[in-house]
From Swiss-Prot:
Subunit structure: Homodimer.
Listed InterPro entries: Adenylosuccin_syn_GTP-bd (IPR018220), Adenylosuccin_syn_Lys_AS (IPR033128), Adenylosuccinate_synth_dom1 (IPR042109), Adenylosuccinate_synth_dom2 (IPR042110), Adenylosuccinate_synth_dom3 (IPR042111), Adenylosuccinate_synthetase (IPR001114), P-loop_NTPase (IPR027417)
The protein's required cofactors: Mg(2+)
MF (Gene Ontology): adenylosuccinate synthase activity; GTP binding; magnesium ion binding
Record text on cofactor binding: Binds 1 Mg(2+) ion per subunit.
Protein name, as recorded: Adenylosuccinate synthetase
Binding locations of IMP: D13, E14, G15, K16, N38, A39, G40, H41, T128, R142, Q223, T238, R302
Cellular compartment(s): Cytoplasm
Family: Belongs to the adenylosuccinate synthetase family.
Its EC number(s): 6.3.4.4
UniProt organism field: Enterococcus faecalis (strain ATCC 700802 / V583)
Keyword Magnesium: yes
Amino acid sequence: MSSVVVVGTQWGDEGKGKITDFLSENAEVIARYQGGDNAGHTIKFDGVTYKLHLIPSGIFYKEKISVIGNGVVVNPKSLVKELAYLKENNVATDNLRISDRAHVILPYHIKLDQLQEDAKGENKIGTTIKGIGPAYMDKAARVGIRIADLLDKEIFAERLQINLEEKNRQFVKMFDSEAIEFDDIFEEYYEYGQQIKQYVTDTSVILNDALDAGKRVLFEGAQGVMLDIDQGTYPFVTSSNPVAGGVTIGSGVGPSKINKVVGVCKAYTSRVGDGPFPTELFDETGETIRRVGKEYGTTTGRPRRVGWFDSVVMRHSKRVSGITNLSLNSIDVLSGLETVKICTAYELDGELIYHYPASLKELSRCKPVYEELPGWSEDITGCKTLADLPANARNYVHRISELVGVRISTFSVGPDRNQTNVLESVWAQI
């Protein structure tokens, strides 16, 4: 029995897709356990770049099973489009499995998402308007429609009718907006359900059977720990649990079956949307990092906010997600900077603190305390080992590992697969 969880340790966009794809080579099952099509991951496979939002990275390996777990909220329309996109590119999808317990995103979720965000005005959260939050709200309120319900025409019609009555009251009376008609949704989305029916099953059985048979299972998180609804910068968070603990809820695999947790981070920090970001850069250095790192959202296309590496954030992520191994990406983006900085602590009202505050008021008063290190000018995109790195780059990597308190198992010096370098095999440690 071998299992590895891949989690983002910052605010998403850390390069999880590439690392998941890299680790997938030695896995037999790859599963997603939370989030929806608000998450975007970019994968290069056989020289082609693919952008996926719902389907796990393992789909490119015909002999491996890819799982969308029960903790994922699925927009059937988006999923059907993504399947068609893969088929157009001659990528087989018959190795996909979708949980019958996963909840469904419907048009009224997306409309409610937009209306609620607009109503917040300056206090908006920066949602991707994909209906993720409202779908999870319905799930918690026990009025959600699951994949199993979508496939049953009678049950789907009954629950859709009940939900539309409630949602339309909100649209008309609270937001002064138009109602959504039953016929605008029912036949179209029932048909989407029929198109994905061949993939639907009890994925908890598949995952547990695989682990019990001694197979290697890789769990792929979306977003990042700092967007976790419990452990992140609430309320500027997603509506699910990207932390490693979310695996047990979102996949139906017990915690005793989790072996390793790989935390993925960039050599700097980025964030899409609103919310606290203590090390954010607003100067030329920030513009350089954004330009060189091509920091634009996979899902939204929005420019990402960028800043220095924050070890306070990383230690928080390590603690709440039980990170055992670190994967450090995008070191090459910092090449050419005369000085690189690492945030080692915050100064709050004249005192040093080393933990990430829950209070947004406290966070707004936190000033990052930096350790400055000399930068490097060399092109490192061809480096294969730590010894190949310039001394200053190597020292930077070592210092990050020291401050976070986790050994680095892989490091990346570019977007391509062959630019990801293994220092210690995670699978070999199990």
